[in-house]
Amino acid sequence: MIYMLDTNIIIYLMKNRPKIIAERVSQLLPNDRLVMSFITYAELIKGAFGSQNYEQSIRAIELLTERVNVLYPNEQICLHYGKWANTLKKQGRPIGNNDLWFACHALSLNAVLITHNVKEFQRITDLQWQDWTK
């Protein structure tokens, strides 16, 4: 199984709070993969540039990416994005742009999106998601 961690889950994992996130990671099967979208990676880098200790933040991100692969766009992401951006707009229930990209990236890989932001992602009925903070 592919598990795509969104930004809030990655930050929880890096801070080891709540501890249940690390516990869930330790319970994964050998063939399971932890990945993050390039958008999550960009958000982490943005945070590092805004932090008081840039070098320490970048090093923490580098260590993280040794375990959690960064995945980059493919055509399928765009197809899912076009579908869901219009579907949600017609329903009058759009979600944030980055969240929509996360969801579409996970859909393109048939991955489970791991998030604490379930309210937004519940709107995308094709998406598999889990909240590992519970």
UniProtKB/Swiss-Prot annotation:
Q: What CDD domains does the database record attribute to this sequence?
A: PIN_HiVapC1-like
Judging by the UniProt lineage, the source's domain of life is Bacteria
Species for this entry: Haemophilus influenzae (strain ATCC 51907 / DSM 11121 / KW20 / Rd)
What this protein is called in its record is Ribonuclease VapC1
GO terms (molecular function) for this protein are: magnesium ion binding; RNA endonuclease activity
This molecule's function is given as: Toxic component of a type II toxin-antitoxin (TA) system. Acts as an RNase, its toxic effect is neutralized by VapB1 antitoxin.
Q: Could you tell me the keywords of this UniProt record?
A: Hydrolase, Magnesium, Metal-binding, Nuclease, Toxin-antitoxin system
Which cofactor does this sequence's record say it needs? Mg(2+)
What Pfam family is a match, any one?
PIN
Q: Where does Mg(2+) bind?
A: D6, D99
Q: Does the keyword Magnesium apply?
A: yes
SUPFAM superfamilies this protein is in? PIN domain-like (SSF88723)
Family according to the record: Belongs to the PINc/VapC protein family.
Keyword Repeat, does the record have it? no
Top-level taxonomy? Bacteria, Pseudomonadati, Pseudomonadota, Gammaproteobacteria, Pasteurellales
The enzyme's E.C. designation: 3.1.-.-
Q: Which residues form the PINc domain?
A: 3-132
